[in-house]
A protein has these predicted regions:
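Hydrophobic alpha-helical transmembrane segments and their immediately adjacent juxtamembrane loops
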Residues: 168-263
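Long amphipathic alpha-helical coiled-coil segments
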Residues: 147-160, 184-196
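Peripheral, non-transmembrane regulatory/ligand-interaction domains of membrane transport proteins
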Residues: 1-149, 155-156, 169-172, 179, ...
Length: 263
């Protein structure tokens, strides 16, 4: 009873004297739901009785209810457990496909985007989603594996085989999530490297511009002092000669930095 009514539960399997306790968690797929929200499903299963407890509607159970209403649902306890596992694995595979699609879009945007400011929160959100899913994939894999390996007498061989396959499926989903987390980390590293490179390029450009204008400013400063003996001060062509010399100096500095690959 405590396991069925606990407010916060982790996926697990436990054997009791007259049945088994199976606790699973599913992603909340309802409209406007928080994608990080998880719904707990608590099942007490005996030879001829199933007691389920949940605080909110769960798609995996709703599908079974619809099938039973149409007289096409599971006909035994074993079939019910397999149906629950199939529905959960299917829903999680669809959610995982959506996460992969989001990551593909981020990678494509990273390769094309000039502005990467919007990519960082998208990657962070995707990683949080993947971590949340990964947190429950492996425990659910272990729960279904325990049912298949330590199965009660009322679970037949075919159901045990399907439960074992479901355990393997959750294991594959967990491996896929780990691969997604690895890809997301690589994408985040590429984004960080791109941002660092852009910052370095901007700093280098500003430094080169300052290096070009510093000697020009020094020369014009010398020519602007109010003392006698300034060259070309009395010449009508002095302004143009000085401007040409400064322009030539600026071009020479620009060519120097360009040849040194600073530009």
């Amino acid at each position: 009873v405590e396991g069925l009514l606990a407010p916060d539960t982790e996926p697990r399997y436990a054997e009791l004297d007259d049945g088994i306790l199976l606790i699973l968690r599913e992603v909340n797929t309802h409209e406007n739901a928080d994608p990080h929200d998880m719904i707990s499903l608590r099942l007490w299963v005996g030879p001829a009785r199933i007691i389920s407890a949940r605080l909110r509607h769960l798609a995996a159970i709703e599908d079974i209810k619809v099938a039973l209403a149409k007289k096409s649902g599971p006909g035994s306890v074993s079939e019910f457990l397999c149906a629950v596992g199939r529905n959960m694995a299917k829903e999680k595979a669809e959610i995982l496909a959506g996460v992969i699609e989001d990551l593909d879009e981020i990678d494509e945007d990273l390769a094309q985007a000039d502005d990467t400011k919007t990519l960082r929160p998208r990657i962070a959100k995707l990683r949080r989603r993947a971590i949340q899913l990964h947190r429950f994939f492996r425990p659910q894999r272990a729960a279904f594996a325990d049912i298949a390996e330590r199965r009660p007498a009322w679970i037949d061989d075919s159901a045990a085989d399907e439960l074992a396959e479901l355990s393997a499926e959750f294991g594959r989903l967990a491996a896929d999530i780990e691969a997604i987390l690895g890809r997301a980390q690589v994408t985040q590293d590429e984004l960080r490297s791109l941002e660092n490179q852009r910052a370095t390029d901007i700093t280098t450009t500003l430094t080169v511009v300052a290096a070009i204008f510093l000697p020009l400013g020094f020369v014009t400063g010398l020519l602007g002092i109010n003392v006698g003996g300034i060259p070309l001060a009395e010449s009508k062509a002095g302004f143009w000669v000085t401007s040409g010399a400064l322009l030539a100096l600026g071009i020479a500095l620009w060519l120097y930095f360009r040849n040194r690959r600073y530009l």
